[in-house]
């Protein structure tokens, strides 16, 4: 596309009518490279909404890339907003440097976003569940080969992170 920003919406998901407005305003207000929002889930099997709200006490939070990487494990423990491809708006110029790892068939979102966070200057989180993640039959997505591939790709990514080569230095 010819735009300045990119968002990803899965074909079977949907978003609130002000989804892009919320993400765009946060990105512009904070002069960030990436804006992240949270999500709610709709399970097709039981026709129910599942809403989580783990990050209480603030409407918006701003991170440098190093701050986000340092807190990623804690943040990801309760809320997958930072790892999923959905619910974000990104400056398109960052995507010229990073692509999805097509060898990974499960969990490729997290690797992709960690790489983007590493090359971003600032990330803003908006505590708003404007993305609706639709779940149908979860079991069909998790075969043994996909799990093996995912484990191997995560090990490869850990090795990449351990290299500690510029510009991705993790030394304090």
Language-model features, listed with the residues they occupy:
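C-terminal subregions of glycosyltransferases and related glycan-biosynthesis enzymes
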Residues: 125, 129-172
């Amino acid at each position: 596309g010819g735009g300045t920003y990119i968002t990803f919406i899965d074909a079977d998901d949907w978003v609130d009518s002000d989804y892009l407005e919320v993400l765009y305003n946060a990105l512009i207000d904070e002069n960030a490279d990436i804006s992240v929002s949270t999500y709610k889930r709709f399970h097709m099997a039981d026709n129910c909404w599942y809403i989580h709200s783990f990050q209480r006490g603030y409407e918006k939070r701003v991170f440098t890339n190093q701050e986000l990487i340092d807190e990623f494990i804690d943040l990801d423990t309760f809320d997958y907003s930072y790892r999923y491809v959905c619910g974000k708006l990104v400056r398109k110029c960052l995507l010229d440097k990073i692509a999805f790892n097509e060898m990974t068939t499960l969990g490729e979102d997290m690797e992709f976003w960690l790489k983007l966070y590493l090359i971003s200057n600032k990330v803003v989180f908006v505590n708003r569940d404007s993305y609706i993640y639709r779940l149908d039959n979860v079991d069909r997505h998790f075969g043994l080969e996909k799990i093996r591939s995912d484990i191997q790709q995560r090990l490869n990514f850990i090795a990449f992170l351990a290299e500690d080569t510029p510009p991705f230095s993790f030394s304090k």
